[in-house]
């Protein structure tokens, strides 16, 4: 199987609408330039990230981590990397009106990877919390408020996982990948954490391929990506484009260097008219999530403008 075909398989693009000619050519160019690396490059990438986890633990004298095991490939790969780095890993499943298959995959990943598992069923807690909020805001139950209700689930899970991390005197792992970071497909003060080993990895190729290499079960590697919140029929249905399409545009733009306007982005990509609407939808997604990546936006002291720089210097000196 060629690398091109492998990427279509691991991104699940081969189960969806075929790539347009422009996207297919962009994939070929991305393979040729090394943006989509082969197995050897991925092995090196994975081992360097594991070394980074190990170095972090040695620097800050910590080696325990709690990870929310959603049943998806991101959390499973994150757990596998921490385990490979020699950390004590607690995988926590936290179902809330969950598809049982997702919870089962989270448990199976813990068993396969040989890490400790704990289940905290938050369904009743969430229902009570939702009722309390609805008593003060009846609109929360409306059909068009799924996103708000979903964010409540995520933040309830984050409270739980941080409590578990505190109990074991460890930290919380962030399981977001680079694609989700750029798309804003995460909740502020929700599904984030203290150390993010896979946040530089693409969802369409590096995450699933590395997950298989690290021993994650195949049913998890190839599971349909969902937010686990019941907001839509999978991540890509919510986006309106596939992860592979998103990553191809994102990673190509990351190579551009200086970009000043949207027009610069489109010109650099050399997007044909037939694909312009699709690419603009991707650019809109990145643009509308910028506020998440800059949160909180810290205003500079109007007189003593170097305070943040000074604090960074102090932090570096003390560590």
Predicted regions, residues:
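ATP/NTP-dependent adenylation/nucleotidyl-transfer catalytic domains that generate, transfer
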Residues: 2-67, 90, 97-98, 105-124, ...
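Short, hydrophobic alpha-helix immediately C-terminal to the catalytic nucleophile
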Residues: 76-83, 162
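Conserved G/P- and acidic residue-centered "switch" motifs that form tight phosphate/ATP-binding loops
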Residues: 72
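Conserved S-adenosyl-L-methionine
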Residues: 84-89
